[in-house]
C-alpha cells in the first residue's frame, strides 16, 4: 500500500470507521456476489463483476471515501490482417486512492482479434483493460474486495451454496415525479387542465351533433337549447362547483330578481347557418317515423331465421331430416368400380400372399394397355 506525497488535502478516517472497514475487508464474499464464465480448456472461471466491485467499494469506503485514476495506457500491438481486420492489445494501469491518502494500483489488460473497425477495437480494449485494472487494484485492499476468489478451498465451498434471490423493490427506484424540481411540479398540474379542456370540448361536440340530428325542430327551440347547454359548460367548469347565482354579475342578478325575467340573451352566431340549412330541407320530403318503423318490420319479417349450428350423429341427422333418401345408403364392400384399374388374376375380395412373377406380368400388361 502506498501513500500520496501531499498529505495536506487528505482526510483521516476516524477510529470507528477504520475498525468497521477492517472488519468488512476481512470478510469473504457471499454467493450472490460471485459470477462464473467459461474459461480456457473447457473449465469455468469465477470472477467479480465490475459493478458489484464498485458497489462494495462505496459500501465499505463510502461514496466519497475513494477514487480511481488511470496512470498509464500502453498499446502493446496493433495488427492488420489480409482481410482488413484488426488485432489489438492494450495494457492499462489504474490507481485506487482512499481519502486518507493510501492507495493501491495494478495493471489490467484488454485485447481483441479480427475486429472489422479499428476504432471499435481500441474502444473495447481500453474499456476492458481499465475495468480489469480497477478490479485488480481494489482486491489489494482485502478479501471482501475480490481477493477471496483466489482461495481454492473457499471456491469449492461457496459454489455449493445457492445464492438468495432477492425480490425487486420498486420503492428504491428514482422516479422523476419524486425529484424536488419546479418543472416536474408544474407538469403534475397539466393533466388536470387538459382533462377540463377535453371535457368542455366533448360537451360542445355532443351539443353540435344533437342539434344537427334535430333539424326538423323550430329554429327558436334550437337556439334556446343551444344557449342553455353552452352556458353551463363555459361558465361552470367540472373542477369548480358554482351555484346558479354565481353565473351572473351583481347588477345582472339584481335585475333578474326585480323583474323576474331571464336576462337578455345575445343572438347566437349560428342562427344564419341553421336558417340556410332549413331552407335546403324545405323542398325535400321528410321521412316520417311511422314509415321507418313499417319498413323495419317488413325487413325483419323477410329475414329468414337460420337455426343454430349443432353437432350430432349421422343416424340422428338422418332420422330428424325426412328429406334425406335412405335408399342405397348402405356401404357395399364388394362393389367393383370401373374407374379403378385392378389386376385380373388377383382376387381382391380376400387377403392372400401374391407371388412376384404375377406382379411383374400384371405390370407389363398394364403398361402395354395404357400405351
Curated annotation (Swiss-Prot):
Residues 346-371 are annotated as: Disordered. Signal peptide: none annotated. GO terms for cellular component: nuclear chromosome; nucleus. The keyword Transferase does not apply. Coiled coil: none annotated. Pfam families: Rad52_Rad22. Keywords: DNA damage, DNA recombination, DNA repair. InterPro entries: DNA_recomb/repair_Rad52, Rad52_fam, Rad52_Rad59_Rad22, Rad52_Rad59_Rad22_sf. Interacts with rph51 and rph54. Active in the repair of DNA damage and in mating-type switching. Probably involved in the repair of DNA double-strands breaks. Has a role in promoting S phase completion. PANTHER family: DNA REPAIR AND RECOMBINATION PROTEIN RAD52, RAD59, DNA REPAIR PROTEIN RAD52 HOMOLOG. This is DNA repair and recombination protein rti1. It comes from Schizosaccharomyces pombe (strain 972 / ATCC 24843). The lineage of its organism: Eukaryota, Fungi, Dikarya, Ascomycota, Taphrinomycotina.
Amino acid at each position: 500500500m502506498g501513500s500520496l506525497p501531499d498529505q495536506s488535502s487528505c482526510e483521516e478516517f476516524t477510529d470507528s470507521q477504520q475498525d468497521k472497514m477492517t472488519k468488512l475487508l476481512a470478510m469473504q464474499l457471499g454467493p450472490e456476489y460471485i459470477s462464473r464464465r467459461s474459461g480456457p480448456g473447457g473449465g469455468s472461471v469465477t470472477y467479480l463483476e465490475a459493478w458489484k466491485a464498485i458497489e462494495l467499494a462505496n459500501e465499505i469506503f463510502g461514496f466519497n471515501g475513494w477514487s480511481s485514476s488511470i496512470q498509464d495506457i500502453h498499446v502493446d500491438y496493433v495488427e492488420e490482417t489480409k482481410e482488413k481486420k484488426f488485432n489489438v492489445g492494450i495494457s492499462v494501469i489504474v490507481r485506487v486512492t482512499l481519502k486518507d491518502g493510501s492507495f493501491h494500483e495494478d495493471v489490467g489488460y484488454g485485447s481483441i482479434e479480427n475486429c472489422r473497425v479499428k476504432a471499435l477495437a481500441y474502444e473495447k480494449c481500453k474499456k476492458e483493460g481499465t475495468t480489469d485494472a480497477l478490479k485488480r487494484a481494489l482486491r489489494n485492499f482485502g478479501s471482501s474486495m475480490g481477493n477471496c476468489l483466489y482461495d481454492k478451498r473457499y471456491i469449492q465451498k461457496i459454489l455449493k451454496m445457492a445464492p438468495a434471490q432477492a425480490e425487486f423493490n420498486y420503492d428504491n427506484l428514482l422516479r422523476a415525479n419524486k425529484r424536488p424540481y419546479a418543472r416536474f411540479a408544474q407538469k403534475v398540474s397539466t393533466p388536470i387542465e387538459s382533462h377540463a379542456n377535453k371535457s368542455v370540448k366533448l360537451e360542445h361536440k355532443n351539443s353540435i351533433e344533437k342539434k344537427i340530428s334535430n333539424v326538423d325542430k323550430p329554429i327558436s327551440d334550437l337556439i334556446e337549447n343551444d344557449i342553455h347547454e353552452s352556458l353551463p359548460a363555459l361558465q361552470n367548469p367540472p373542477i369548480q362547483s358554482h351555484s346558479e347565482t354565481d353565473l351572473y354579475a351583481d347588477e345582472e342578478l339584481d335585475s333578474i330578481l326585480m323583474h323576474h325575467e331571464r336576462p337578455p340573451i345575445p343572438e347566437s352566431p349560428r342562427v344564419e347557418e341553421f336558417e340556410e340549412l332549413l331552407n335546403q330541407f324545405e323542398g325535400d320530403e321528410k321521412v316520417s317515423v311511422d314509415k321507418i318503423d313499417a319498413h323495419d318490420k317488413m325487413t325483419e319479417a323477410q329475414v329468414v331465421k337460420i337455426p343454430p349450428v349443432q353437432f350430432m350423429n349421422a343416424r340422428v341427422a338422418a332420422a330428424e331430416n325426412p328429406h334425406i333418401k335412405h335408399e342405397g345408403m348402405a356401404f357395399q364392400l364388394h362393389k367393383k368400380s370401373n374407374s379403378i384399374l385392378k389386376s385380373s388374376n388377383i382376387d381382391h375380395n380376400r387377403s392372400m400372399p401374391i407371388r412376384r412373377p404375377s406382379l411383374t406380368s400384371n405390370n407389363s400388361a398394364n403398361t402395354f394397355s395404357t400405351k
